[in-house]
Swiss-Prot record:
Comment block on domains: Dimerization mediated by the LisH domain may be required to activate dynein.
Chain's gene name: PAFAH1B1
UniProt entry tagged with the keyword NADP: no
Protein name: Platelet-activating factor acetylhydrolase IB subunit alpha
Record region (Interaction with dynein and dynactin): 83-410
WD repeat boundaries on the chain: 106-147, 148-187, 190-229, 232-271, 274-333, 336-377, 378-410
Organism: Sus scrofa
Region (Interaction with DCX): 367-409
Sequence segments annotated as region (Interaction with NDEL1): 1-102, 388-410
Amino acid sequence: MVLSQRQRDELNRAIADYLRSNGYEEAYSVFKKEAELDMNEELDKKYAGLLEKKWTSVIRLQKKVMELESKLNEAKEEFTSGGPLGQKRDPKEWIPRPPEKYALSGHRSPVTRVIFHPVFSVMVSASEDATIKVWDYETGDFERTLKGHTDSVQDISFDHSGKLLASCSADMTIKLWDFQGFECIRTMHGHDHNVSSVAIMPNGDHIVSAARDKTIKMWEVQTGYCVKTFTGHREWVRMVRPNQDGTLIASCSNDQTVRVWVVATKECKAELREHEHVVECISWAPESSYSSISEATGSETKKSGKPGPFLLSGSRDKTIKMWDVSTGMCLMTLVGHDNWVRGVLFHSGGKFILSCADDKTLRVWDYKNKRCMKTLNAHEHFVTSLDFHKTAPYVVTGSVDQTVKVWECR
C-alpha cells in the first residue's frame, strides 16, 4: 500500500514523537536526521501519542471486523440451512430465535428456576420472592401463584406425569405440591441450611435434594421421610440431578467438583475435578445424543458396547465441560461465556448444547465443532435458568431482571 507524501510525513512525525517520548534518544536523533524532520513545539503537540492512538484503534477495528465476519457467517448459514428461503430445517436442529415470543413479568425478585410441565402447555417459575408461578407458554397468560415457602424458592421439579411438583427453598424446607389441586401436600424438614436443589426421581417415589449443609438427601414421596444421606462434598452443594433410569445421581458444588453417586449403595462412583471455580449446574446427556457425542469426542465404545453415560457441567470459571462418567474423563471444554455459567442442557435433538449465564446471554453450541453457533442477548440482567421443551419447539429462560422469557425454536 502506497502512502501519500502527507501521510508519510504524518507517520514519520508520529514515530519521532513515540521514540522521543519513550526515551529512545539516539534512535530519535538518527531517525529525525534521516527522515529530514524539522520538529517544532506546535507540530509536536499535534503528534503527541498519535502512534499509540492509531495502534489501539486498529486493534479495536480488527476485533469489530472479526465480530462482524462471524455474524455474517452465521447469517449465511441461516440463509442456506434454515431461513424461509433455504431448505426447511429438521426439527432436531431447531434452535431458539430472537426476539422472544413472550416476556412475562409478575415476580417481585429475581427468578431462580424455570421448567416446563411434561404434559400440559404450562411452565413454572420459582423466585427469590418466595413464590412459584404458573404460566401458559403458548398464550403468555399468567395462571396462578403457589405460596407457602417463607424464603427464596431455589429449585422446582415435576414428576414424569406432571401431577406432582417438588420445590425447595432457603427456608430449609422441601415442599411437595399436588399440581392438579395446587395444594401443598407435604413439607419436609431435615437440611440444616439453604436447600439449593431438588429433583423427583424418575420412578416418582423418591425425591433428592441438595443443600448448603454440604449434603444430598433422598426422601420418600409417600411418607416424607428422609431415607438416605449422601456425604462427601466439602462445601455447599449447588445442584443435584438423577440420570434417566434413576440408578445414578450427579451433584455439583462450591468445592469445584462434580460427583456421581450410585443410588443403591450411596457410594461416590466418580469425582470429576477440572473446573477452577464453583460448579453451578449439571445436566445428563439424553441417550439420543450418545452417537453424536461419541463421534464428536472419539470416545471409544467400552467393552460393554454401550457408550456413556455423559454429563455436562457449567461453572463460575465461565466454561462448560462434558464428561464421560464411566472413565471420569473430561471430553471437552466449551469456552465463550463472559461470566458465570448458570444453566446448561442438551438440545432434545442431541446435536447441540444450550447454556445461559451471567453475561445475560443464551447460547447454542455445536459441540461437534466445539463452537458457539448462536448467541442471544436474552435478558437485561443475569440469566439464571433455562429449560428446553422435550417435544414442543420452545425454550424458556429466567433472570435476575425478574422476567421469564419464552423463545420459539425454528
